[in-house]
Every structure is written in structure tokens, then in C-alpha cells.
Amino acid sequence: MGLNFFMSRKIYYIKLLTGLYKKFIKALIVKKNESNNAYLLVETANFYNLVFSLQRSSLTQFKVLNDVCIVDYPEKIDRFELSYNLSSIKYNFRIFIKTYTSAYVPSISTLFNSANWIERECWDMFGVFFTNHPDLRRILTDYGFEGFPLRKDFPLTGYIEIRYDDEKANIVYEPLELSQEYRLFNFTSPWEKIK
């Protein structure tokens, strides 16, 4: 069995996926490279049903959630792009499911145990709310932390300073008085050629 057989099997599998789940899928993108990964673009309303079907169907069996990645695009209406990386061990196939949201996404922690901490981290760093999550609370920052530090509109200096005070022998929270404007990245890079 050569590489061509393996690639044709992957392409067949991608076509099978699109046929089975066309009512859920908004768009399908296949990267033409050695991996032929499939990227499914899904509306947030159809997201949970698609993942549930992909996991439970005997034709797909995506039983492993590898990772969830978030990108913040503040200029868009649905500013957060979530990319879920799922694997089917039985069929030796990996799929990426992308959805866009401005506020919330259905939690898949009931389907994948590994999603619990990943979704908590996404909430803590970006502020994306996962509906029906059993324990959505901060996991990396302090419980009194204000804001979401990986959003592009979060100030580099933060909002408060946390330090240990030797005189009080306690941790002290003080508001920062540094003024910082919104970060705009509209400048020429020194690595780009000037025309």
C-alpha cells in the first residue's frame, strides 16, 4: 500500500464526512499537502450537534480531543475563532472544526473529559463563555483578576499591580496609574521593503 492509496483513502473519508454532516457544515476546506487535513467551518448553533455526531457515529469515531485554539479578531463582529482539533484513532484521521463567536459556545466537556480544563483556560484568558460547562471558573489567573489577558484590547500593563508588602506581611493589590492607548499595529515593519 503506497502513499497514493493512503491519500485517496483520506480524500474518500473527507467526502464521506461532508455527505454525512452537510446540514451542520457551513464550509469545508481541505489543505492540499502531505496531511490533507480537513477544516470544517460550523455555525455556533450547530457546533455541539456536529461534535456529538462525529464522536458517537461508528463511521467517524472521533474519540480524542487534542486541543482547542482561540484567535482574537477584535475588528470582526464574531471576534473569536475557535479551532477544535479532533482525532479518530480507528480511522487514523484528524479533523479541525472551526467556529466563530462573540460571546458563547456550547461546552463539549460532557463529550470529552479533556475539554473541561481547556474550556476553563479559554474562559480565563479570552472570556469566551461555554454554556452548560460544569465548573467554569478561572484556572490560571487569580480569582479576583479583572479582564481577560489574551484579548488584544487588554492593556499590556494590566489594571492592578499585585505585590508582597514586607511591612504588612501580606499581598497588596494596587490600581495602576499608567496610561496606555489602544495598541494599533499600523506601522511599517523594518523587515519589509519600503516602496
UniProtKB/Swiss-Prot annotation:
Catalysed reactions, semicolon-separated: a ubiquinone + NADH + 5 H(+)(in) = a ubiquinol + NAD(+) + 4 H(+)(out)
EC assignment: 7.1.1.2
GO cellular component: mitochondrial inner membrane
Keywords for this protein: Electron transport, Membrane, Mitochondrion, Mitochondrion inner membrane, NAD, Oxidoreductase, Respiratory chain, Translocase, Transport, Ubiquinone
Protein name per its UniProtKB record: NADH-ubiquinone oxidoreductase subunit 9
Record flagged with keyword Transport: yes
Location in or out of the cell: Mitochondrion inner membrane
UniProt GO molecular function: NADH dehydrogenase (ubiquinone) activity
Keyword Translocase: yes
Taxonomic lineage of the native organism: Eukaryota, Amoebozoa, Discosea, Longamoebia, Centramoebida
PROSITE patterns associated with the record: COMPLEX1_30K (PS00542)
Organism the protein comes from: Acanthamoeba castellanii
Role summary: Core subunit of the mitochondrial membrane respiratory chain NADH dehydrogenase (Complex I) that is believed to belong to the minimal assembly required for catalysis. Complex I functions in the transfer of electrons from NADH to the respiratory chain. The immediate electron acceptor for the enzyme is believed to be ubiquinone.
InterPro entries, per the entry: NADH_DH_suC, NADH_quin_OxRdtase_su_C/D-like, NADH_UbQ_OxRdtase_30kDa_su, NADH_UbQ_OxRdtase_CS
Subunit structure: Complex I is composed of about 30 different subunits.
Gene3D superfamilies: NADH:ubiquinone oxidoreductase, 30kDa subunit
Family per similarity comment: Belongs to the complex I 30 kDa subunit family.
